[in-house]
């Protein structure tokens, strides 16, 4: 299944593993914020499609927001992504409809790196209507998931996905 979708598995021992140290508390990491509890556990592994994750995530900002994006929200998202792209920031989002889709699409149009963090297995394009977007992202950026191939999207997985989006970026911009 991984080979069919062009994915690979990485672990914390992989050279491609991103720097999660500032966000996750593990192995006695005293630098992680003390307010984090169980949700601050680093993933054991990640499934990846596209460019090496450490490279694309090195200078990244999350751009996220509502699924029901307004015309103003679309315009604001595109402007934010354009400004970040001018300074070579990678755009990270969850691949959902709304602001996430606008952010990824704008990044691709501006030829800046983008990372889609899936709330399902790496072999499952969700939402289905964004399948072409995920394929474009995998060609020029990176698609990742902490869920095993074959894992379907479930409500609780979106929260876990959001934690990963926040952990791998220098900051988060919430549009609408």
State what each model feature region is.
Residues 4-5:
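A short structural micro-motif
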């Amino acid at each position: 299944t991984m080979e069919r979708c062009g994915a690979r598995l990485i672990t914390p021992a992989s050279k491609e593993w991103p720097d999660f140290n500032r966000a996750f508390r593990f192995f006695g990491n005293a630098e992680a914020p003390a307010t984090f509890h169980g949700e601050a556990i680093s993933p054991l592994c990640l499934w990846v499609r596209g460019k090496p994750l450490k490279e694309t995530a090195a200078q990244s900002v999350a751009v996220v927001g509502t699924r029901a994006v307004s015309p103003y929200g679309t315009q604001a998202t595109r402007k934010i992504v354009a400004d970040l792209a001018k300074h070579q920031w990678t755009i990270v989002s969850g691949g959902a409809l709304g602001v996430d889709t606008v952010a990824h699409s704008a990044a691709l149009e501006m030829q800046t790196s983008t990372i889609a963090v899936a709330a399902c297995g790496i072999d499952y394009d969700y939402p289905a209507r964004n399948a072409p977007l995920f394929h474009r992202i995998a060609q020029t950026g990176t698609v990742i998931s902490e869920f095993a191939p074959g894992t379907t999207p479930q409500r609780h997985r979106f929260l876990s996905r959001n934690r990963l989006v926040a952990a791998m970026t220098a900051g988060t911009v919430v549009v609408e």
